[in-house]
Amino acid sequence: MTEKEHFFWNKLLELAKEELTQATFDYYVLDTKLIKIQDNVATILLEEVKKLFWEKNMQSFILMTGFEVYNSEIKVEYVFDEALVSETKPTLANNDFSNKREQQTPDLPTLNSDLNSKYTFDNFIQGDENRWSVAASLAVADSPGATYNPLFIYGGPGLGKTHLLNAIGNKVLHDNPQARIKYITAENFINEFVLHIRLDKMDELKLKYRHLDVLLIDDIQSLAKKSTQATQEEFFNTFNVLHDNNKQIVLTSDRNPDQLNEMEERLVTRFKWGLTVNITPPDFETRVAILTNKIMDYDYHFPPETIEYLAGQFDSNVRDLEGALKDISLVANVRQLDTITVEVAAEAIRARKIDGPKLTLIPIEDIQSEVGKFYNVTVKEIKATKRTQNIVLARQVAMYLAREMTDNSLPKIGKEFGGRDHSTVLHAYNKIKNMLAQDDSLRIEIDTIKNKIK
């Protein structure tokens, strides 16, 4: 630049800094560059997403500075890639939005989406616990940026958040192969940021993330736990650019936005701009459906009772079910089995059970008998439908102990209690479990019954 061009540019920056907030100046103005002023036309290099801001907010500053330095009106041409700047006289840009020219776009680098192609909506098992999350994910995949932006999905580990993130990306890519999509964990985003800072290549990082069509960030809580203020600042700016340009953002977390205590408040606020949905652990029917789907990957026959047994053993997340199938596969392979019985499954998963080996040899009838003796009711009454208070308590305690002390599936336990549904067994189990946390006398009663059964 000539000395006069330097003077013009410095005056313009000083004026903008006086009139704009510090954050606005830092984001929209600080990293722009004056290429040249020729024939009263200033060629200014900036990111394409900032052009509209300059046209709306900087034109008056340019006009004032132009008359002060050049005693003339200075018009503007905005360019987005310095390598494409022409030596010929540029087309003028002004505030007349009815005469917009075609925008130049940066030469974007090749992007690896890092999507896992095996995760799709077709193989995601829906249940009541994830129905809203699936519906919202399908909506943003069908129309990225048009609704629910950002989409924030939270829940415990192993419940399908990563699956949904990838399913969104895979569907968008299927519908639009040219779409720029990036799946990344928050921790890897932090690592990329640190690397680009160390190499002094932040422009590359901005070019990569601020020109996406869909950004999918997994485990965003890591940004609060492990990042510096500078990392959160960069993500804040990236979020703003994408959101302002109606580009889709989807985030997952192990907690809802309000519980991200170490996250900057302005980020938490933005996370809540769109839709927040929760995924909870799958119910029994969903676990059966998940297992039925996943055993298709194995060359073994799983009878229905084995599937129901496994579904009754793990109720916290899908990863436990997947791990159980791997354990069973190992045992079946070593023994060269074709059919996985309940007994084989019980032996294979024994080490995986948190509370150690179950007493698989204890008959449910023995539990019913001891509970009946303690509460002075008959086994026949426990199995029947009579609902007097002492019988109901005895029945629920017996169901609780059958769940705790045996490896029987919920449907099998229900069958032993007069053909009751598995949901009745689960309700009884949860009720007694909750009562034990508050009722010391009940805990003593159940411990006494357990000792007699053993």
From Swiss-Prot:
ATP binds at G158, G160, K161, T162. Keywords: ATP-binding, Cytoplasm, DNA replication, DNA-binding, Lipid-binding, Nucleotide-binding. Residues 1-83 are annotated as: Domain I, interacts with DnaA modulators. GO terms for biological process: DNA replication initiation; regulation of DNA replication. Residues 83-113 are annotated as: Domain II. One of its GO terms (molecular function) is ATP hydrolysis activity. GO terms for cellular component: cytoplasm; plasma membrane. Residues 333-454 are annotated as: Domain IV, binds dsDNA. Residues 114-332 are annotated as: Domain III, AAA+ region. It comes from the Bacteria. Its main location: cytoplasm. Signal peptide: none annotated. It is found in: Cytoplasm. It holds the Pfam family Bac_DnaA. HAMAP family: DnaA_bact. Domain I is involved in oligomerization and binding regulators, domain II is flexibile and of varying length in different bacteria, domain III forms the AAA+ region, while domain IV binds dsDNA. Belongs to the DnaA family. Oligomerizes as a right-handed, spiral filament on DNA at oriC. Plays an essential role in the initiation and regulation of chromosomal replication. ATP-DnaA binds to the origin of replication (oriC) to initiate formation of the DNA replication initiation complex once per cell cycle. Binds the DnaA box (a 9 base pair repeat at the origin) and separates the double-stranded (ds)DNA. Forms a right-handed helical filament on oriC DNA; dsDNA binds to the exterior of the filament while single-stranded (ss)DNA is stabiized in the filament's interior. This is Chromosomal replication initiator protein DnaA.
